[in-house]
């Protein structure tokens, strides 16, 4: 595998600390849908659906380059039901979602893959890092739920900040990424021969250097298995895999979500908001 194309990668959920450039993988519970949201024109959205945001947290100077799958290292995002995709203005990547449409129905809950962006000209940040200025006001009383499971309501701090989103470049996932197209049709994104990446790499919009790499909405049991590549400040790369490392690859158990304890029970990595 050429690391320049799909940099092997490293993704970890929660707040696992490492000696390398990757500090954490953070899973943010962004929003929990209610009855009003379910009745929007954006497509079928079951009550109680959870919108998750996944961030790669890196040391200063490091860049997110790619999430990848190759033989022996499956890249997988899955739910036991279906992923929600907004049928009105949704997209497989957020770069194609106009800022002006974010206020419409449930566009803000669309499922997509990212390299830092959250819309056409906005970047994604943790709600807890949002200053609450220029918060999006949703039309017709949508997205007003204050479920404590999701922490800060998005009507107060929406997790968007102005910026130039890095463009997502995909390799070999044209069929797989269709699960995030503008209709709810599937429950699994999987590839063993492809990646989503950003040429030149991307850094986070805050000093913490967290890059948003995906947003997924589902009412099912959400899980993933990730492999990630990040670029070092000196121009090198660090590659992290969920299983079976070879060569210079680094295996990190937290790339599998939810994690499994030694006794076989499952343990959710630390999420935002804290439990």
PLM regions and their residue ranges:
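Bacterial Sec-dependent N-terminal signal peptides
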Residues: 1-24, 268-275
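Non-catalytic macromolecular-recognition regions in eukaryotic signaling proteins
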Residues: 20-267
């Amino acid at each position: 595998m050429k690391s320049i194309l799909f940099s092997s990668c490293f993704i970890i959920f929660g707040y696992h600390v490492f000696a390398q450039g990757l500090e954490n993988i953070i899973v943010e519970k962004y929003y929990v849908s209610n009855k009003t949201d379910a009745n929007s024109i954006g497509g079928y959205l079951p009550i109680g659906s959870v919108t998750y945001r996944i961030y790669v947290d890196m040391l200063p100077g490091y860049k997110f380059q790619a999430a990848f799958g190759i033989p022996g290292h499956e890249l997988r995002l899955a739910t036991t039901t279906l992923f929600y995709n907004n049928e009105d203005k949704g997209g497989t990547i957020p770069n194609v979602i106009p800022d002006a449409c974010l206020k419409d129905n449930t566009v803000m809950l669309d499922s997509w893959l990212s390299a830092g962006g959250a819309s056409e000209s906005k970047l994604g940040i943790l709600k807890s890092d949002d200053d609450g200025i220029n918060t999006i006001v949703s039309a017709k009383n949508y997205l007003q739920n204050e479920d404590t499971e999701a922490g800060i309501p998005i009507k107060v701090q929406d997790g968007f900040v102005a910026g130039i989103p890095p463009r997502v470049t995909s390799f070999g996932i044209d069929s797989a990424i269709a699960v995030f197209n503008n209709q709810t049709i599937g429950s699994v994104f999987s590839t063993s021969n492809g990646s989503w990446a950003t040429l030149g790499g991307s850094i986070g919009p805050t000093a913490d250097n967290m890059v948003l790499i995906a947003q997924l909405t589902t009412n099912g049991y959400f899980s993933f298995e990730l492999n990630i590549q990040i670029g070092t400040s000196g121009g090198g790369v660090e590659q992290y895999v969920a299983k079976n490392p070879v060569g210079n690859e680094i295996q990190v158990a937290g790339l599998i979500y939810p994690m499994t304890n030694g006794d076989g029970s499952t343990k959710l990595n630390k999420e935002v908001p804290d439990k």
